[in-house]
């Protein structure tokens, strides 16, 4: 099985402009994420897909492989689908460029189901939440997911799901970790599909897959590392990197 990692990276960001080039202990954010991906054991190649010449020029100075993509892509998965057409592979990992602390073990975990006799259409990661974790459950920036008994996603939402009607019982809640691995052919089919009603209502591209009948296997991870979406996130990640360097 040949798996590749593609990291979509765009320069524009509403909440944190040019965050991909933000400095983290001497290296740009996107370079930090690329370095983590390069340590992955189950992928044979790591590529960054971008529509920004500025990002491409920075990455090439570090030796990263870069593919230029169209600025018309509607989401990260469409951008990696465009890039993936240039490579012969069985599985494509969509790793967000703003995840500089993600471990290679976590990426490998997302690829694990594709080594089974019955691989899924797509896999992703989820982190277990406590039912009383009110802040994360009610934060629309934290996407929640409910699973069936086999570990496949039933639904993703920015609202707290499942609703805890009976406070005397507790149901396991999960937060979605935005990393995906696709069968190569499923990725291309997904990118060709028009956006769906639920996808647009929640602003969650993975709902396009569920609405069209694809199955998403959710692997539970306990490695909870922050991504970079806001200026506050960036400062937290900088602090964590500094602590790691001091401990090394």
Swiss-Prot record:
Source taxon at top rank: Bacteria
Protein role: Activates KDO (a required 8-carbon sugar) for incorporation into bacterial lipopolysaccharide in Gram-negative bacteria.
Keywords: Cytoplasm, Lipopolysaccharide biosynthesis, Nucleotidyltransferase, Transferase
Name this polypeptide is given: 3-deoxy-manno-octulosonate cytidylyltransferase
Gene: kdsB
Single annotated GO MF: 3-deoxy-manno-octulosonate cytidylyltransferase activity
Compartments (UniProt record): Cytoplasm
The keyword Transferase belongs to this UniProt entry's keyword annotation: yes
Entry similarity comment: Belongs to the KdsB family.
Gene3D superfamilies named among the record's database cross-references: Spore Coat Polysaccharide Biosynthesis Protein SpsA, Chain A (3.90.550.10)
GO terms for cellular component: cytosol
Catalytic activity from the UniProt record: 3-deoxy-alpha-D-manno-oct-2-ulosonate + CTP = CMP-3-deoxy-beta-D-manno-octulosonate + diphosphate
Enzyme superclass (EC): transferase
One Pfam family it belongs to: CTP_transf_3
GO biological process: CMP-keto-3-deoxy-D-manno-octulosonic acid biosynthetic process; lipopolysaccharide biosynthetic process
Protein species of origin: Chlorobium chlorochromatii (strain CaD3)
């Amino acid at each position: 099985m040949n798996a590749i990692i593609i990291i979509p990276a765009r320069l524009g960001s509403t909440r944190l402009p040019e965050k991909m080039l933000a400095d983290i202990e001497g290296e740009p954010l996107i370079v930090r994420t690329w370095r983590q991906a390069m340590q992955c054991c189950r992928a044979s190649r790591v590529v960054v897909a971008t529509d920004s010449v500025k990002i491409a020029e920075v990455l090439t100075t570090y030796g990263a492989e870069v593919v230029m993509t169209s600025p018309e892509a509607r989401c990260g998965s469409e951008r990696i689908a465009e890039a993936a057409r240039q490579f012969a592979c069985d599985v494509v990992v969509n790793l967000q460029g703003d995840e500089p602390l993600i471990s290679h073990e976590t990426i490998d975990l997302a690829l694990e189901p594709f080594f089974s006799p019955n691989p899924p259409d797509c896999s992703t990661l989820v982190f277990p939440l406590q039912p009383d974790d009110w802040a994360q459950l009610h934060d629309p920036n934290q996407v929640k997911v409910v699973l069936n008994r086999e570990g496949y996603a039933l639904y993703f939402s920015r609202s707290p799901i499942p609703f805890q009607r009976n406070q005397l019982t507790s149901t396991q809640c999960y937060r979605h970790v935005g990393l995906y691995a696709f069968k190569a052919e499923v990725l291309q089919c997904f990118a060709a599909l028009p956006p769906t009603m639920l996808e647009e209502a929640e602003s969650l591209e993975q709902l396009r897959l569920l609405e069209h009948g694809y199955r998403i296997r959710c692997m539970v991870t306990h490695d909870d590392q922050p991504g970079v979406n806001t200026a506050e996130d960036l400062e937290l990640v900088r602090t964590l990197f500094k602590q790691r360097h001091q401990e090394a």
